[in-house]
């Protein structure tokens, strides 16, 4: 259940510009899903930082954001050197999860992708989730009165694997929260 907050008429979607660079493409010269996902996650971090609740601010209290769930849809993958914009906005804070939304548009303003992410705040020492009720109160002015661009992510149902693979974890697999890097799995 989400807390009730009054929407601030001044809160608007934030927009950040990107370009598909050579390191972001596959052999067809189209942006890879991990590179587009990376721009989505980078946008989340940049926007949170700009609003005063980025990882740097949270780390001072031994807290951090952790991506809990992510749902993405891409209609196409832009080609190398294509300029695009990622718009982001927060639609709600729940007790445990915050919902952040994204749309990706090309230079002509055509939407080609959308995402909804849900984030938990953790205590870095106990590694447990923190109640976000205070965040909704302290940062109600960051909430934008706009619907998510796609369905919120859901818990993945249990599967019975038919094959297994082993992967030895290496340095580059681990992020700053000491978790497996989001775009690796």
Task: Name these PLM-found stretches.
Residues 6-185:
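Terminal targeting signals and extreme-terminal segments of soluble enzymes
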């Amino acid at each position: 259940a989400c807390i009730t907050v009054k929407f601030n008429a001044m809160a608007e979607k934030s927009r950040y510009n990107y370009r598909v660079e050579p390191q972001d493409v596959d052999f067809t010269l189209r942006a890879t899903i991990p590179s587009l996902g990376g721009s989505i996650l980078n946008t989340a971090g940049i926007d949170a930082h700009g609003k005063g609740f980025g990882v740097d601010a949270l780390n001072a209290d031994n807290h951090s954001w952790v991506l809990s769930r992510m749902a993405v849809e891409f209609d196409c993958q832009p080609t190398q050197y294509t300029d695009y914009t990622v718009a982001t906005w927060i639609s709600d804070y729940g007790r445990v999860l915050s919902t952040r939304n994204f749309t990706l548009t090309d230079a002509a303003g055509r939407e080609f992708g959308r995402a909804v992410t849900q984030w938990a705040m953790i205590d870095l020492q106990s590694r447990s989730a923190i109640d976000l009720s205070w965040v909704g109160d302290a940062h109600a002015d960051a909430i934008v009165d706009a619907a998510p661009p796609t369905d919120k992510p859901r818990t993945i149902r249990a599967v019975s694997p038919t094959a297994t693979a082993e992967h030895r974890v290496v340095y580059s697999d681990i992020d700053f929260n000491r978790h497996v890097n989001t775009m690796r799995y």
